[in-house]
Curated annotation (Swiss-Prot):
Its EC number is 4.2.2.2. This is Putative pectate lyase 17. The keyword Calcium applies. Keywords: Calcium, Lyase, Metal-binding, Signal. Pathway: Glycan metabolism; pectin degradation; 2-dehydro-3-deoxy-D-gluconate from pectin: step 2/5. It holds the Pfam family Pectate_lyase_4. Belongs to the polysaccharide lyase 1 family. It catalyses: Eliminative cleavage of (1->4)-alpha-D-galacturonan to give oligosaccharides with 4-deoxy-alpha-D-galact-4-enuronosyl groups at their non-reducing ends. It is an enzyme of class 4 (lyase).
Length: 394
C-alpha cells in the first residue's frame, strides 16, 4: 500500500469522527466521548487543511483551490481567489515606487491577485510591506524568503492569505514614505520588526510558513483584528512568538477570534505561543517543544481553549507550566480550559473559570480536533513544503 493510499484512508477515518466542540462544563473541563482513532500513532496522516489539497498533483494549475481549505475562524478567507495570477520575477524592492515583477508591486494592487514566484529568491525589503485586500502570497514551487529587513504589515484590510514562505531575521522599518496602493503613498512611523503584523484586519490566513529570529514578534494580531487562522507554521529561535491583542486597555479586542492549529512551536522559543488579551483563542493540535518560560499566556480576561495539543516541557523545573497569567491575582474566573491535551516531561496546564465555554464556530468553520497523541504526525510537515509541479507536495 502506498504512502498516499495510507494517508487517504487515515484522513477519511479522521474526518468522519464526531466533532469535539461540545459545551465545556465544570472547573476542570469536559471529557468528550472517545473517538475511535487509531490506538497507536499513525505515521502517515494529514490534518484537515493539508488533506484538502496536498494529495492533488494538479495543485500548480489549480492554485486557488487552496482558498477552500482553511479551517477555524479564518476559514472564509478568500485571498486572491478569482483574481489573476501575478508572478514575482525578481527580489528587488522600492518602497515608494515598486516596479512590475516585484513582490511589492503585486501586493499593493487594488484588485484581487494570486501572487506566485518564478524562482527561488531572498527578498530584503526596503521598508515594511503593506499588503492590500484580496491578496494571496503563495510560495509553493519555489524557495522564497523575506529576510534581513522590515517584513509584512497587514493593516486595515481583509482577505489575505500568506502561504509557503520563510520570514526571518526581520528588522524594524524606517520612518518614511511607503506605498500601500496604486494611488496612495503614506508616511509610516516605522514598523517594530515583526515577521507579520495584522492590525485592524479580518479574514487572514497564515499557513505553512517558517518564522524565526525577528527583532520584535513573529506574529502580532492587534487592534480588533478578527477571523484569523494561523496553521501549519514552524516557529523557532525567538523570544516573544505570537501576540493576540493590542494592550490590556484596548477593549475593542474583545471581538478578536483566532484559531491557532497544527503548528510546530520548535526549539529556542521563550514565550507567547500565544499570549492573548480579551478575545477568544482556540489553540488546537499544536506541538510545543521545550519552551523556556511558558507556552500559553494572557491578561485582561481572554478566553483560551487548549484542545488536543502536545506539550513537551523543558528539563528545567521552573518552566514546566504551560500557562501564565500576566497578573498577580484576580484571574480565577478567566475561562482557560484544556481538553485532550498531552503533557510530557512534567508539563502541566492550570485551568480556570466556571460554567460552559462553547466554541463559537459556524458550521463552515468547524473542524475535527484530534486527540493530542496524534499531533506529532499532524504537525510533521509544518512550515514550507517541497512542492514540485505535476506532483503532490511533500
Amino acid at each position: 500500500m502506498t504512502h498516499f493510499t495510507v494517508s487517504c484512508l487515515l484522513v477519511a477515518l479522521f474526518l468522519c469522527q464526531s466533532l469535539v466542540h461540545a459545551a465545556y462544563n465544570g472547573y476542570y473541563g469536559y471529557s468528550p466521548a472517545a473517538a475511535p482513532y487509531p490506538a497507536e500513532e499513525p505515521q502517515n496522516i494529514m490534518n484537515p487543511v493539508d488533506s484538502c489539497w496536498r494529495l492533488k498533483s494538479d495543485w500548480d494549475v489549480n492554485r486557488e483551490d487552496l482558498a477552500d481549505c482553511a479551517v477555524g475562524f479564518g476559514s472564509s478567507t478568500l485571498g486572491g481567489k478569482k483574481g489573476n495570477i501575478y508572478v514575482v520575477t525578481n527580489p528587488y524592492d522600492n518602497a515608494q515606487n515598486p516596479h512590475p515583477g516585484s513582490l511589492r508591486y503585486g501586493v499593493i494592487q487594488a484588485k484581487p491577485l494570486w501572487i506566485t514566484f518564478a524562482k527561488d529568491m531572498v527578498i530584503t525589503l526596503a521598508n515594511e510591506l503593506m499588503v492590500n485586500s484580496y491578496k494571496t502570497i503563495d510560495g509553493r514551487g519555489a524557495k522564497v524568503e523575506i529576510a534581513y529587513g522590515p517584513c509584512i504589515t497587514i493593516q486595515d484590510v481583509t482577505n489575505v492569505i500568506v502561504h509557503g514562505i520563510s520570514i526571518h531575521d526581520c528588522k524594524p522599518g524606517k520612518s518614511g514614505k511607503v506605498r500601500s496602493s496604486p494611488t496612495h503613498v503614506g508616511h509610516r512611523k516605522g514598523s517594530d520588526g515583526d515577521a507579520i503584523t495584522i492590525f485592524g484586519s479580518s479574514n487572514v490566513w497564515i499557513d505553512h510558513c517558517y518564522l524565526a529570529s525577528c527583532t520584535d514578534g513573529l506574529i502580532d494580531v492587534i487592534h480588533a483584528s478578527t477571523a484569523i487562522t494561523i496553521s501549519n507554521n514552524y516557529f523557532t529561535q525567538h523570544d516573544k512568538v505570537m501576540l493576540l491583542g493590542h494592550n490590556d486597555n484596548f477593549v475593542k479586542d474583545v471581538k478578536m477570534k483566532v484559531t491557532v492549529a497544527f503548528n510546530h512551536f520548535g526549539p529556542g522559543l521563550v514565550e507567547r505561543m500565544p499570549r492573548v488579551r480579551r478575545g477568544y483563542a482556540h489553540v488546537a493540535n499544536n506541538r510545543y517543544d521545550k519552551w523556556i518560560m511558558y507556552a500559553i499566556g494572557g491578561s485582561a480576561d481572554p478566553t483560551i481553549f487548549s484542545e488536543g495539543n502536545y506539550f513537551i516541557a523543558s528539563d528545567k523545573s521552573y518552566s514546566k507550566e504551560v500557562t501564565k497569567r500576566e497578573v498577580k491575582g484576580g484571574w480565577n474566573n478567566w475561562r482557560w480550559r484544556t481538553s485532550n491535551d498531552v503533557f510530557k516531561n512534567g508539563a502541566f496546564f492550570v485551568p480556570s473559570g466556571y460554567g460552559s465555554i462553547p466554541l463559537p464556530y459556524s458550521s463552515a468553520q468547524r473542524f475535527t480536533v484530534a486527540p493530542g497523541n496524534l499531533v506529532p504526525s499532524l504537525t510533521a510537515d509544518a512550515g514550507p513544503l517541497n512542492c514540485n509541479r505535476n506532483g503532490p507536495c511533500y
